[in-house]
Regions:
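A helix-centric hydrophobic-segment signal that preferentially recognizes long
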Residues: 2-178
């Protein structure tokens, strides 16, 4: 009985459909997953002539830590807000979670601007004022380089030309490619 059911045309059709579906999902995972990984590598890895966004985030973490050291004796509330936002980015940074880094970076930008305003309003001595200027310059420079990174255009191009087009958009969701 078992041998006869495998020879039945409907059984053969179902097996063929399942095999094709499985092959399509595996191909999508491999091809799109490979391209997504390549783009993510551009976020994490510096290339000749351009440092990665990941390394620029490290600069922002360093600059925000420096600002925190100035601010902690001047405005505890602003220092705490900066510390919380910095910790969130540091956690995302250490886990290498790009989406979480994006969100935490936006929050750190707000907290840094607020902390900068609080530090500028405080009466700083000459060395603190010089350090503040250096931290702000480093932070803003890193932010500008992140905005101008070629990674951003490569993500946009990939999303427009591949990921958001049918059938890749449907298959990626189905295959679990993020």
């Amino acid at each position: 009985m078992y041998k006869r059911s495998l020879k039945h045309p409907i059984t053969a059709l179902l097996i063929a459909i399942l095999a094709c579906g499985f092959a399509m999902v595996m191909n999508t995972q491999m091809m799109l997953g490979e391209k997504v990984q390549e783009i993510e590598d551009g976020f994490l890895t510096s290339t000749p002539g351009e440092r990665s966004i990941y390394s620029r985030l490290s600069e922002k973490l360093d600059a925000s830590n420096g600002l925190w050291t100035i601010l902690e004796s001047e405005d505890a509330a602003a220092a705490e807000e900066l510390s919380v936002s910095r910790s969130a980015l540091l956690t995302a940074y250490e886990s290498r979670d790009i989406a979480a880094m994006y969100d935490a970076n936006a929050e750190l930008d707000k907290a840094f601007a607020s902390a900068k305003a609080a530090a500028e309003a405080a009466e700083l001595d000459e060395s603190q004022a010089s350090a503040l200027s250096s931290y702000v310059t480093n932070y803003e420079g890193a932010s500008k380089m992140i905005e101008q990174s070629s990674y951003n255009s490569s993500v946009l191009e990939f999303m427009r030309s591949v990921y958001n087009k049918f059938p890749a958009s449907r298959l990626a969701d189905f295959a679990g490619v993020e």
